[in-house]
């Protein structure tokens, strides 16, 4: 079996997440009773690329994944993946760095022109 370079250096949790995404896409397509050939045609990709997506292949561009999600009517949540509301670690770090007090900067002193 040939392994792509990206799957060799990719962290295990990321590989698992991509495989799960692929399975979820496959299951969503099946629930909608959309044959693979038609889903591929609607996404303007080959049937082979759709199979790769449904297996969670990391070599497929994220834009292609997004297009397939669009075909399935599921692209609306894609834009929220890294939104601040879904980032508890980032929100916690941001909260820890908030200043205790905010001071007004002194206005520059005017000098009299002679």
Could you say what each language-model-derived stretch is?
Residues 6-31:
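A short, Lys/Arg-rich alpha-helix, primarily the initiator
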Residues 25, 36, 47, 62-65:
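Helix-turn-helix DNA-binding elements, focusing on the entry/boundary residues of the two helices
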Residues 33-51:
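Short alpha-helical DNA-recognition segment
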Residues 48-52, 70-73:
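Base-recognition residues in the alpha-helical recognition helix of bacterial helix-turn-helix
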Residues 56-70:
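Short, basic-rich loop-to-helix N-cap that marks the start of a DNA-contacting helix
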């Amino acid at each position: 079996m040939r392994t792509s370079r990206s799957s060799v250096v990719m962290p295990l949790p990321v590989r698992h997440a991509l495989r799960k995404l692929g399975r979820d896409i496959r299951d969503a397509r099946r629930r909608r009773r959309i044959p693979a050939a038609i889903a591929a045609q609607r996404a303007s990709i080959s049937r082979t690329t759709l199979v790769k997506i449904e297996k969670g292949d990391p070599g497929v561009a994220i834009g292609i994944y997004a297009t397939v999600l669009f075909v399935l009517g599921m692209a609306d949540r894609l834009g929220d993946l890294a939104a601040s509301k879904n980032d508890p670690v980032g929100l916690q770090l941001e909260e820890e760095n908030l200043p205790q007090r905010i001071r007004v900067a002194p206005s520059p002193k005017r000098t009299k022109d002679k």
